[in-house]
């Protein structure tokens, strides 16, 4: 579906480009931002998109979030993360791989579902952290990651992961008020855990 009077195109890197009468003329008193966003009449959206056979377009990820592995492969984190998060046992997944030789992930379990599973397995625990450290829970999440990996290409597969010992929290700056992950902040806060995945 294309809006009347609009043209769409994909740049070589997959960025969605748009032009037409309803595209804005630029940022008010911000010529540099305008120059970076509007080039040769095309609005550079900052979104990576995919065009389908029926000419419809799907937004895949933000261009700024694209990772480039040590091997030079461009990867879209949200594709990998959504595959992992399709598990009911996994609440959040943050993949790491920019400049790295393989993909790893920080995973937050779904407390309610994993705790119900643990009770059904007759496993006793006291805290969220205690639950994430249990061998049975780690094995459960490994099986879920392995299942999700089957739908990913070799370079996208999550090779190692770390279970977060606490739930991501807005007050700690890990997520926004609307619960969107703050990737750069999390990478700083969990640097030790990330580095341990690559040892």
Over which residues does each language-model region extend?
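C-terminal boundary motif of the adenylate-forming
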Residues: 48, 87-113
